[in-house]
Amino acid sequence: MPTSRLTLFWIMLCLLLGVNLWQASVTELIYDEAYYWYFSQQLAWGYFDHPPMMAWMIALGRLLFSGTLGVRIVGVLFSAATYLLVWDMISGVKKNHYVPEFFLWVFSMTLLNAYGFLILPDTPLLFFTALFLWGVQRLLKKNSWSYAFWVGTAMAAMMYSKYHALVVILGVVIGYWPLVRMTKAWVAVLWALLLYTPHLYWLYTHDFVSIGYHLSERPNQPYRFDTFTLGYFINVFAQFGFTLPWVVYAWYKTPKGRFNTVLKSLVFFVLTFFFISSFTKRIQTQWIVVIAIPTAVLVWELYLRDTKIRRKLLVSAAITTLVLVYARFGLVHESLLPIRYETHGNLAWTSRLKASVGDSPVVFLDSYRNAPMYAFYQGGSSYSLNTMGYRKNQYSIDGSYEQIRGKKVALVAPKNHVFWQTNAPEFSFEKAVDDTYHGLWIDRFTYYDQIKASLVQVDSDQAIVELVHPYSYPINAQHIFLSLGVIDDYKRVQQQIPWSLSGQRLPVVWKAQDTLRLVLNKPELLSREISGIRLGVGSFDLPAGLQGDPQKRTTWNP
């Protein structure tokens, strides 16, 4: 690359880096970012929802800066490195003459743009996908051991970022079958598995909680064409905006070659995989973001060779970029957008809540999103109490309850939460316009979310329930109650039925690590035809939680 062109490339890359650093520092966190920040407070080899890469990145960033920039800075640097890797994978000799045009093109890709300043699982996934493909390109050119280990390291890093990385790896291998016959490719896989062993061990010691949640426990909903399959195609458009026609054209018209075959196969595999998946679940926009990396290369390879599409592509990219620039300003200034987004008002509502509760710990009913957001902006302890109608999350497994056990806490929930049907609020605050939260005080917070409840035997009118006490200290079993949740085919709780423990001799001192075996009558109001059940245990006046796993049953009878 001529010196002047090289200088221009680095100037534009640094300008983009500077813009993203500014945006990262002035844009309030979105809820998922706050949740991942919470991960970073307790570094581990894994977390309930995701592998640990984001937590590591955020922890590193917090050593460098405070505030939102500290949370996001490593992701911003990864984004800049991603653009550099994409540029280096483009083989056209004329690319040095189109540096500004290249940056216009990559900046116009919606989520590649957004992950330039947001820290989400796809931020490292995009970077390590680019690193992986960069290594594959060189392994195909020069079948060397160094590139084999490079590819293996990148594969492991992808899997440490997000489980969807497996789709990328399979897409490359299945799409370009000759890789299977390469000894060094197998060495790369073995090296990746070795590097990934700590996370696999973490999954093993935590009963594969992440895999179980994503594959079986996660609630779903009935199929709807508009939100499932049609929504999938809308998400594809959202990836590329007005450049989509030229993206599709490039997928078909890019010149042949081993590496281009790899890239095309990856795009086709990812799109096909999630298209088929759209008939069983809603496809989130970011799930297909990995196609941005191979697409960025393929489109620019064609741009350098096909003069007919250049103007059309750049005009489309410019229109999309203008929309994205306006949206990015709108993330900072709420008045610019017609809707309220997650980056608006978080410091304000957490400050209002802080004014009501002072330095007391805050327990949020059913919100792993609000709890870390409050802790990030206001400090102190917060916790998500997950009831039967909600879902498990990191607060379910990390022992954070012990930090506030027995303390005076403020419990808060939206004003329309079912909890307020039987409890009177003691204070309120506005989270946003027309979004009021109520709260009350609990002098000695006690909740047993780690009890394991299971239905081990069912007769026509009775059942045997086992409750396993996992804590290292005794508890008073007379303070607990049992609820039976009736779930539908999509694991959503449709009805909660109190399950009377009358006649049971519950101990005042329930010894640590002990198991209670209860013989209970069939709950009243339970119909015979059901899709499944879930047990929950509550304590005092606090609602039943997620102590039991979903169990498929068609009737109450055995």
Over which residues does each language-model region extend?
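Short acidic/glycine- and proline-prone juxtamembrane loop motifs at membrane-interface regions
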Residues: A114-L125
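Short helix- or helix-capping micro-motifs
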Residues: F102-T110, M155
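Transmembrane-lumen/periplasm boundary regions of multi-pass, lipid-linked membrane glycan transferases
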Residues: A157, V167-N260, T272-F275
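Transmembrane-helix motifs of polytopic, lipid-linked glycan transferases
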Residues: I73-K95, S108, L131
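Membrane-proximal, lumen/periplasm-facing interface regions of secretory-pathway glyco-
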Residues: R311-D359, S367-Y383, T387-M388, L411-K415
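Extracytoplasmic catalytic/substrate-binding loops of multi-pass membrane glycan-assembly enzymes
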Residues: A24-Y36, W45-M57, F65-L69, D207-V209, ...
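Membrane-interface alpha helices of multi-pass inner-membrane proteins
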Residues: Q42, A114, R138, W145-K162, ...
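Membrane-interface transmembrane helices that cradle and orient dolichyl/undecaprenyl
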Residues: G92-N96, F132-Y147
